[in-house]
UniProtKB/Swiss-Prot annotation:
SUPFAM superfamilies: ATPase domain of HSP90 chaperone/DNA topoisomerase II/histidine kinase, HSP90 C-terminal domain, Ribosomal protein S5 domain 2-like. Residues 566-640 are annotated as: C. The keyword Nucleotide-binding applies. It is found in: Cytoplasm. This is Chaperone protein HtpG. GO terms for molecular function: ATP binding; ATP hydrolysis activity; ATP-dependent protein folding chaperone; unfolded protein binding. Homodimer.
Amino acid sequence: MAQYKFETEVNQLLSLIIHSLYSNKEIFLRELVSNASDALDKLKYLTLSDEAYKQIKFEPRIDICFDDTANTLTVRDTGLGMNEEDLKNNLGTIARSGTKAFLDQLAAADKKDSNLIGQFGVGFYSAFMAASTIDVISKKAGENDVWKWTSDGKGAYDLEKVDDTAFPIIDGVPEGANGTCVILHLNNEDSEYATRWRIEEIIKTYSDHIAFPIYLHFTEKQYDDKGKVKSEASKTEQINDAGAIWQKPKSELKEEDYFNFYKSLSHDSQEPLLYVHTKAEGTQEYTTLFYVPSKAPFDMFHADYRPGVKLFVKRVFITDDEKELLPTYLRFVRGVIDSEDLPLNVSREILQQNRILSNIKNASVKKLLGEFKKLAENDKEKYNKFIAEFNRPLKEGLYSDYEHREELADLVRFKTTSPEVKEDEWTSFADYVSRMKSDQKAIYYITGEDEKTLRQSPHLEVYKQKGFEVLIMPDEIDDIIIPSLGKYKDWELKAANRAGSDKELNTEEETKEAEKKEKDFKPVLEKIKEVLGDKVKEVRFSKRLSDSPSCIVVDETDPSLQMERMMRAMGQFNTSAVKPILEVNADHPLVQKLKDSKDKEFVEDMSNLLLEQALLVESGELKAPVDFVKRLNRLMTNLK
């Protein structure tokens, strides 16, 4: 017997699980049954597609036994099984990037969320919520060696080579069968999980639609009229439906059936926001059952996110690790695709180039987007919940999926300055257009890092003054997505924080008056530019400001300051910094003081402050904050 230490991440996870109170501790059994089902799926696929496994007799079953005297619970499957290396890799480590971020998220949660554990794919460890010690006995299909893994979840595990006699004898399970047996030595306070009624209740709730039979072994007792046991008999009953729910007619299924299958499929304890069940017949036959979770998957913005859709061919599991089954922007969708036409031995390379699967993918995207549209039209409250979780991925689709760009443009939502819409409500492009002024030529929007700051931005002063609505876009990807979209139907999309976007807001008379004022103000602009030098691209007379002394904008062809910061953080911006354009409000008292001043130090300080305060409002940061404070102190000292 050899002892091994858990990796640091496993120790962290076990500590979180064991020392946290979970409101639904019972999910550990769902996780163990789900793991058993996955092992059966994998072996079924190999026996049909891999010559090395075709001689193995596939006899799928999951058996659950309990001993209320010894306080143990056993889950046995006849699936693929694990050898020594598999046990070390699967039960001794968490071989996924993003582990630390996940553990930090779990630890920081106000209410420790067992749902996150299942989503992350480490559900086996949840068994330590109910067990003081766990034994795992496993024999890999096609191999003769049997291995036993044992741990109390306190930092280490034992691993030893045993033989077939280490497996408990279970009625119906062939002697020497491959697969895995998990034996939980339950905590005293968790003895309820060694009772027939509790096990049946959990399986019916979470695992009824597991596609393989689940057998419960128990002792049935007969009592006499005095309450004494007169006879005992060992019994075995199948306690799950064991049907592929997606192959059943919709008329035979209740909402509860769909919800229970979703929980089993996704390891999510919450009900889905939406489900879409489709059966296609004709030149191609396939069935899809898709779900939209109530909450975004924790890894939705990780590069190595886990795909949520499983591919089956004629009810045979093929893969759950193929990111091409749906577009990346629909990575939050969970569900199954079951094709009647794909070959069973389809490889990943064939999958990515397969015309049949490509057609299924395109049809699925149209179906899902159509269902999202129906939800938006028929249930605004539920759609707002959907948008709160998945607006950003949909916006990614505007950039990546040209074919469905129009549909996606009608689905995405934004915050707005419109007085008709509350600040916590969303609006669409179509809603914006319905509120446009009769002579309005464009849809106006503003991008930045923070909604509250954007609502108070100096750039919006002229829009508010003249009653033009502006869409608020604080998402960092908006700076990429919206310019790539360019227009919505017949209306151009214009950024309020870009140079020249305010030109059409003024009447002809106002424009002429501004041009005259600008001409008179030109010496002041030149004075400010001389002070600022190459800190700015240009200093301009502002037609958009009414209350603020200054603001910065960027040229129409330059990336925004937010975009520049994002690209630099990603290592994709190697050129010199984008120089902003400083716009100055000629009517503001501070600017008037600068105009009239002959004090060189005052002119220098005020010119720099006009730029720095505008940068602070725009980005919340300065390159030389100490110099800014010194200038501010000098000016305040000279106040009269």
